[in-house]
From Swiss-Prot:
SUPFAM superfamilies: Urease, beta-subunit. The keyword Cytoplasm applies. It is an enzyme of class 3 (hydrolase). This is Urease subunit beta. The lineage of its organism: Bacteria, Pseudomonadati, Pseudomonadota, Gammaproteobacteria, Vibrionales. One of its GO terms (cellular component) is urease complex. NCBIfam families: PRK13203.1, urease_beta. The keyword Cytoplasm applies.
Amino acid sequence: MIPGELRVNDDLGQIELNVGRTTQTLSVANYGDRPIQVGSHYHFYEVNEALHFDREATKGFRLNIPAGMAIRFEPGQRRTIELVEFAGKREIYGFQAAIMGNVDKHITTTIPDDKEVK
């Protein structure tokens, strides 16, 4: 064995993430002048306002990528991403404090409206 090597039992098949959870695909554009990086568990509804997309549709969703990973949006870049719904109690605290409690029941504070993304 080589130091740091991982040996995986191929008979077990592929590991599937977020099986059975609601997902959505979304087009996102960075209208800002700096790169923006979003981590795997960041509440997508509350990301940097320079990212333009259907923000209301992302309430209660995060990136559908492995834990600890991130996606970087370069200035002027548009990319298609996949989001996955938060599970468990669906309580969201922190970030920009737009949701402070259960995402299904909470009334959000004001986040600047996005320009229509073309």
